[in-house]
């Protein structure tokens, strides 16, 4: 783990032999993999020892159909034909994508592609598997499945697993050892309990800790906890249960004064006409994949709404219908009163701006200034005025106006893409995994900017698999599964509905799950809590009251 630009992907490239065989530069020292010096053997030889799953999955895919993607590596490595079928079937089943075997890769969601890439590499049985942010496009349940699969491969096949990842809660649960990189050097290393005890040091360099670890560290600072930091909800629940005086039990009916509740939608949000309306929308792709059924949804100015659900639930299809890229088979989608089926997509684009999961897919100019001004020029704004407005936004974001966007870090490129959205002042913004690939500090910068846009009246709809981010920033969520909306409502209330979360294969944020358990087993004082500081405050208050 580490902030953007820390050297994580470069380290992964060293392990796979891409450095120095593909990426050239000044190289000192040695990298030994399974007894081989990567500088002294060919990249072909290294690839038979080390399997790699890249951060940008589309650059890794070589076939058009899932089965062919699985076969490609096995056939190239000369695996006997009588073993290939068994390996393909077993690996697809292990990763949970047997149903995708005959699907065209172009029709898969980002998360489904990620699973295919992992399965294709696992099928080749490498000695070492290096994964660069393998769960960036995956929902929480699928992310857990990937890590369960990796742990099983480690235990049963003896494969050494090296993962570059931002989801610290998963790392803390599944990894034996954690290395923290900063400025190309190892800043911290050790077992998860040891590393995540350094909360302040980690956050100073742009790395988050599991929320329950933050709770432990805060209670430890107040003399209420000691020993090994908590890494999961079970450990945190036992800790707080042991701290709180036995007098405070589930029979308590009064929460301490000032107990927080999930934030209400902004008062102005529903005073205006809706900017987006889905009315009983139906859609299915020609190949029969990824249909949505009976979608009804309303979005008001100033709202920040999260769309959650597992991969393949229909979230991406919903956003494509919203932007006019897809037209409903029945029902209607209205954007600022415009029927998307009756007007060109270019007209809808004047009202809706999209921030892609991968910013490189929407950057097309040679300088940051030209990139940010581009949308204004497309809207007919005079170039001089477009450049003036773009410069104001660039200055606010602290970006280098004259630099080439692709010379910047992944996080900075995301900020360039966001600046391009902000400058056109859209009525609706669609965010597709806005924090994917960002470190903690960059994530907070992006989301605070998005929240400011909402406060100024922009309606924001956010597809996001990071439930912590959704909990922190979304006022409402829409829960989807199998192309349908299961429910919609206040964020905390729906995340606390364990039956709903199970139906949608969504894992609620750590703090909300912890508060739900504590409200049931310790005291209702913990109900409706969604912040680390609130859990700590209520615990301290209950201890003080004795």
Regions found by a protein language model. Give the residues of each.
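Conserved ABC transporter NBD signature motif
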Residues: 25-36, 331-339, 348
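Conserved ABC ATPase "signature" region
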Residues: 82-100, 384-401
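Catalytic Walker B motif of ABC-type/P-loop ATPase nucleotide-binding domains
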Residues: 129-132, 429-432
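Conserved ABC ATPase "signature" C-loop
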Residues: 184, 482-483
């Amino acid at each position: 783990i580490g902030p953007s630009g820390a050297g994580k992907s470069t380290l992964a490239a060293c392990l796979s032999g891409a450095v120095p065989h593909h990426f050239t530069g000044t190289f000192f020292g040695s990298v030994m993999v399974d007894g081989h010096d990567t500088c002294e053997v060919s990249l072909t030889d290294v690839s038979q020892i080390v399997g790699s799953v890249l951060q940008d999955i589309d650059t890794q895919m070589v076939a058009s159909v899932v089965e062919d993607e699985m076969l490609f590596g096995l056939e190239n490595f000369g695996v006997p034909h009588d073993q290939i079928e068994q390996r393909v079937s077993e690996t697809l089943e292990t990763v949970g994508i047997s149903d995708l075997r005959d699907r065209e890769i172009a029709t898969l969601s980002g998360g489904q592609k990620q699973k295919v890439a992992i399965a294709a590499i696992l099928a080749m049985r490498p000695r070492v598997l290096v994964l660069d942010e393998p769960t960036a496009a995956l929902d929480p349940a699928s992310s857990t499945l990937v890590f369960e699969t990796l742990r099983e491969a480690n235990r049963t096949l003896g494969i050494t697993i090296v993962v570059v990842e931002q989801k610290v809660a998963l790392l803390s649960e599944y990894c034996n050892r954690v290395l923290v990189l900063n400025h190309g050097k190892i800043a911290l290393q050790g077992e998860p309990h040891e590393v995540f005890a350094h909360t302040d040091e980690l956050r100073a360099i742009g790395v988050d800790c599991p929320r329950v670890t933050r709770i432990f560290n805060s209670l430890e600072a107040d003399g209420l906890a000691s020993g090994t930091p908590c890494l999961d909800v079970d450990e945190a629940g036992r800790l707080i249960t042991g701290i709180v005086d036995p007098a405070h039990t589930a029979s308590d009916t009064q929460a301490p004064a000032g107990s927080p509740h999930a934030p209400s939608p902004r008062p102005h949000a529903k005073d205006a006409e809706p900017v987006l309306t889905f009315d009983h929308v139906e859609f299915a792709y020609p190949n029969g994949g990824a249909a949505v059924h009976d979608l009804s949804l309303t979005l008001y100015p100033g709202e920040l709404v999260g769309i959650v659900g597992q991969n393949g639930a229909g979230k991406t299809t919903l956003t494509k219908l919203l932007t006019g890229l897809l037209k409903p088979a029945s029902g209607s989608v209205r954007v600022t009163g415009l029927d998307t089926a009756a007007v060109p997509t270019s007209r809808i684009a004047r009202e809706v701006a999209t921030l892609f999961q991968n910013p490189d897919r929407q950057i097309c100019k040679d300088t940051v200034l030209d990139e940010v001004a581009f949308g204004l020029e497309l809207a007919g704004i005079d170039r001089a005025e477009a450049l003036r407005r773009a410069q104001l936004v660039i200055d606010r974001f602290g970006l280098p106006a004259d630099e080439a966007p692709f010379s910047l870090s992944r996080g900075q490129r995301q900020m360039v893409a966001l600046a391009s959205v902000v400058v056109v002042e859209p009525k609706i913004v669609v965010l597709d995994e806005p924090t994917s690939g960002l470190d903690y500090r960059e994530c907070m910068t992006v989301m605070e900017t998005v929240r400011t846009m909402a406060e100024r009246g922009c309606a924001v709809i956010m597809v996001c698999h990071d439930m912590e981010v959704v909990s922190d920033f979304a006022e409402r969520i829409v829960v989807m599964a199998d192309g349908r909306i299961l429910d919609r409502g206040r964020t905390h209330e729906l995340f606390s509905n364990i039956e709903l979360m199970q139906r949608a294969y969504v894992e609620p944020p750590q703090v909300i799950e912890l508060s739900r358990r504590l409200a049931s087993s310790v005291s209702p004082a913990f109900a409706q809590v969604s912040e680390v500081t609130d859990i700590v405050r209520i615990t301290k208050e209950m201890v003080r009251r004795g």
